[in-house]
Design a protein with these regions (language model features):
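Bacterial N-terminal signal peptides
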Residues: 5-16
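Noncatalytic, solvent-exposed loop/strand surfaces
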Residues: 18-476
Length: 476
C-alpha cells in the first residue's frame, strides 16, 4: 500500500493535479520542477511599473518562490539568520519569518549565490527548507517548527554554494547532497524528519541541479543529475536503477519529464568550444611568488572560493596534479541535450537514448517542456525549440535581443514562455512557431537570478532586491 501511495503522489506531483482550484507552485519551477502552470493565465505586459499588484523588499538570493493557496514561501539571509519566510499572496504582507543560526556558513559565491539559495518545497500542510550550512527544517503553514534534521556542512564544488532544492513525494522528503566529499541522496520522513534511507554517490564530486520524480514504467523514481552521469533511483528504497554516462562534468540544470520521455540538457566550459586556461597560463596570471604552486591567497578574493574547489587534496594549495586531474574530468563529458526512454536498468547510455542534440544548450537555465516542444535558452540570449518526440529542431539559437547569462529558468503558461536574463531583461515569447515571436520585453534595472513562479492569474518574480507580484487588479 505504501508503494501505491508513493506512486499516486508521484502522479500528482508530476502533473500538477491539486484538489479543487487551489493555486499550487509547490517547489522550484512548480509541479515536479516542470516550469509549467497548465491552467494559469498570468499577464503578458508586466514590468517594474506595469501590472504590479505589490512589491516587497527582499535580501538577495537565487532562491525562487513556492506557492500553495494564499501562501508564498521564500528564503532570505538577514541578521545572520537562515530564514524561511511566508508572505500573503493577496497583498504581500509578511505572515511569518522563522530563522536558524549556524556557527559557520558554507562557502558560497559572493555575487552569484547566497547561503539560502535553495527553494523551499510545500505539500500544503508543511513547508520544508534546505540550507547547505544547516540541513533540513520543517514548519507548518502557520510557522510552527515541526522538526529539524541537521546535516554536515555542504562543501560545494568550486565554492559556489548549495543550489539544489528538496522535493516531497508522499511522506518522503528527498534532497541531493552532492558535495566535494561524501556525496549522497537522502530521504527523510516528512512527518518526523527522521532518515528513511541514504544512498552514497561516490562518483559525484558536485552538481547544482535539483532532482525530479519520474514514473518509469510504473516504478516511482528520483532522477538526479550529477557530474558526467544522470541517474535514476527507486523512490521507496534509494536503490540505483540506471545510469546514463557521458553528460557534462558540471551539471547545473534540472531534468524535465513528459511525453513518455525524460529530458536533460546541460553545458559547461572546458570543452573545445570554450577551453580552460593551461596550467602555464594560470601560473602566469596568479603565481605571484613564482614558486610553481598556487596558494589560495594568491587569487583575488572574489575568485578565491572558486579556486578552492581545485585543491583536490585539501592542502591549501593548487598544484599541477590537482589541475590536471580536474581538467581531465571536465573534458570527459559531452555538452548535450538527451531524450531518454523509460524501462531501462543498469547502464542505459547506448540502449535508451531516444535522441540527442549538441546545439543551443543551456548552462544554468533548465530546459522547458511545453505543448510537445522542448525549449532551451543558451547564454547570450538565444532560444532553441525541438520536437519533444523526435528531436527535430524547429529553430536553433535564435537571438532574443536580451544578452547576458541566463541563471533564471524559463516557465510557461497560457501559450507563452517567460524567461529572464541575468542582467535583468524579462522576455515573453509566444510558444510554438517556426521562429520565436517576442510578445513583450522589459528591463528591470537590476539582476535576476531567480526563476518566476506562476499561480492562477499571477506571476511572481524575485529580483536582486525585491519580490514582485504581477496581475490585473480585482474588478478589471
Amino acid at each position: 500500500m505504501k508503494i501505491i501511495a508513493l506512486c499516486c503522489s508521484l502522479l500528482v506531483a508530476a502533473t500538477g493535479l491539486v484538489r479543487g482550484a487551489t493555486p499550487v507552485w509547490p517547489t522550484f519551477r512548480g509541479p515536479n520542477c516542470s516550469g509549467v502552470a497548465a491552467d494559469a493565465k498570468p499577464p503578458v505586459k508586466i514590468g517594474p511599473t506595469n501590472a504590479v499588484l505589490w512589491k516587497v523588499p527582499l535580501p538577495f538570493s537565487p532562491s525562487s518562490p513556492c506557492i500553495w493557496g494564499d501562501r508564498l514561501f521564500v528564503t532570505a539571509f538577514e541578521n545572520n539568520e537562515l530564514q524561511t519566510r511566508c508572505y500573503q499572496r493577496a497583498d504581500g504582507k509578511l505572515a511569518w519569518s522563522r530563522g536558524v543560526t549556524v556557527e559557520e556558513l558554507e562557502t558560497f559565491h559572493r555575487t552569484e549565490s547566497s547561503p539560502v539559495a535553495s527553494t523551499p518545497v510545500t505539500d500544503g500542510e508543511r513547508v520544508v527548507t534546505y540550507f547547505g550550512s544547516f540541513g533540513l527544517i520543517c514548519h507548518d503553514m502557520q510557522g510552527t517548527e515541526l522538526w529539524r534534521h541537521p546535516l554536515p556542512m555542504a562543501l560545494s564544488f568550486g565554492g559556489y554554494g548549495t543550489s539544489t532544492s528538496p522535493l516531497i513525494s508522499g511522506n518522503l522528503v528527498v534532497v541531493m547532497r552532492d558535495r566535494d566529499e561524501a556525496s549522497s541522496l537522502l530521504a527523510v520522513d516528512l512527518i518526523t524528519g527522521k532518515k528513511v534511507w541514504e544512498t552514497a554517490r561516490p562518483d559525484s564530486f558536485g552538481s547544482f541541479g535539483t532532482p525530479i520524480l519520474w514514473n518509469n514504467h510504473g516504478v516511482a523514481e528520483v532522477v538526479v543529475p550529477g557530474p558526467l552521469r544522470l541517474k535514476g533511483y527507486e523512490l521507496a528504497t534509494g536503490r540505483e536503477n540506471w545510469v546514463v554516462e557521458g553528460i557534462t562534468a558540471c551539471a547545473c540544470t534540472t531534468p524535465v519529464e513528459g511525453n513518455g520521455l525524460l529530458y536533460f540538457a546541460a553545458w559547461s566550459d572546458g570543452k573545445a568550444d570554450d577551453p580552460w586556461a593551461t596550467w602555464e597560463e594560470l601560473l602566469g596570471k596568479h603565481d605571484h611568488n613564482k614558486d610553481g604552486v598556487l596558494s589560495l591567497d594568491e587569487f583575488e578574493e572574489i575568485s578565491r572560493d572558486y579556486y578552492r574547489g581545485f585543491d583536490v587534496n585539501r592542502d591549501g594549495t593548487v598544484e599541477k596534479s590537482d589541475y590536471d586531474l580536474l581538467l581531465a574530468s571536465i573534458t570527459k563529458g559531452e555538452n548535450v541535450l538527451l531524450a531518454i526512454e523509460p524501462g531501462g536498468r543498469g547502464n542505459i547510455t547506448q540502449s535508451h537514448v531516444a535522441w540527442k542534440s549538441t546545439r543551443g544548450l543551456p548552462y544554468v537555465a533548465s530546459p522547458l517542456l511545453y505543448d510537445g516542444r522542448l525549449y532551451c535558452f543558451k547564454n547570450g540570449g538565444m532560444i532553441s525549440s525541438f520536437d519533444a518526440q523526435t528531436g527535430k529542431a524547429f529553430y536553433l539559437q535564435e537571438r532574443l535581443n536580451a544578452e547576458g547569462y541566463y541563471y533564471s529558468s524559463p516557465v510557461a503558461a497560457d501559450g507563452r514562455l517567460y524567461v529572464a536574463s541575468l542582467p535583468g531583461k524579462l522576455t515573453v515569447i509566444k510558444a510554438g512557431g517556426d521562429q520565436p515571436e517576442i510578445l513583450h520585453q522589459v528591463e528591470f534595472g537590476e539582476r535576476i537570478h531567480s526563476s518566476p513562479a506562476i499561480a492562477g492569474t499571477n506571476l511572481y518574480l524575485r529580483t536582486q532586491s525585491a519580490l514582485y507580484a504581477f496581475g490585473e487588479p480585482a474588478g478589471r
